[in-house]
């Protein structure tokens, strides 16, 4: 990618080309910020407590909350924000993120099976997830390394979507 603007443009074009599928699920009640840092596991009650819901518009496409979960589960958002990721370089000096998660594809496969069982398209969840990474850039502008990692992760995910479409 030539820059963040080209990523925004591509994601926008891909979302618009999938608009019918994206909107097909209608609007449901939404937490609005369904990431791991807003979940508390209560072992004594054998439950998960969701905190810090977004106010305002409580109804959204379910793809949004699914993408927020994927953002944490598969995207590595929490690893980046909590400084648990590293920027590395291949022999050709191509940058990539290294973080200790998803080495085992079973989590991704299980999540994608869950999506497909509800007739949700994993590629649309991935597109929304990329838009989330891009939308986080100005929120972390005080930390150049995090901004670079968020943009790099968005780029990696877009490349994965493009590779999937080319199969």
Predicted regions and their residues:
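An alpha-helical support segment within catalytic cores of ATP-dependent transferases
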Residues: 1-29, 42, 116-117
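Regulatory N- and C-terminal appendages and interdomain linkers associated
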Residues: 2-6, 46, 120-167
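Pre-DFG segment of protein kinase catalytic domains
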Residues: 29, 49-52
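Conserved protein kinase catalytic/activation segment
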Residues: 38-49
């Amino acid at each position: 990618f030539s820059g963040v603007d080209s990523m925004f443009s591509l994601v926008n074009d891909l979302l618009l080309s999938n608009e019918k599928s994206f909107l097909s699920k209608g609007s449901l009640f939404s937490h609005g910020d369904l990431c791991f840092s807003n979940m508390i596991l209560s072992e004594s009650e054998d439950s998960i407590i969701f905190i810090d819901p977004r106010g305002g518009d409580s109804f959204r496409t379910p793809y949004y909350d699914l993408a927020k979960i994927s953002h944490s589960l598969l995207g590595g958002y929490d690893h980046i924000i909590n400084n648990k990721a590293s920027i590395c370089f291949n022999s050709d000096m191509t940058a990539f993120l290294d973080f200790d998660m998803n080495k085992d594809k079973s989590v991704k496969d299980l999540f994608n099976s869950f999506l497909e069982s509800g007739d949700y398209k994993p590629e649309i969840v991935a597109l929304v997830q990329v838009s989330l990474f891009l939308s986080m850039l100005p929120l972390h502008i005080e930390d150049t390394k995090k901004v670079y990692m968020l943009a790099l992760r968005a780029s990696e995910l877009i490349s994965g979507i493009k590779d999937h479409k080319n199969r």
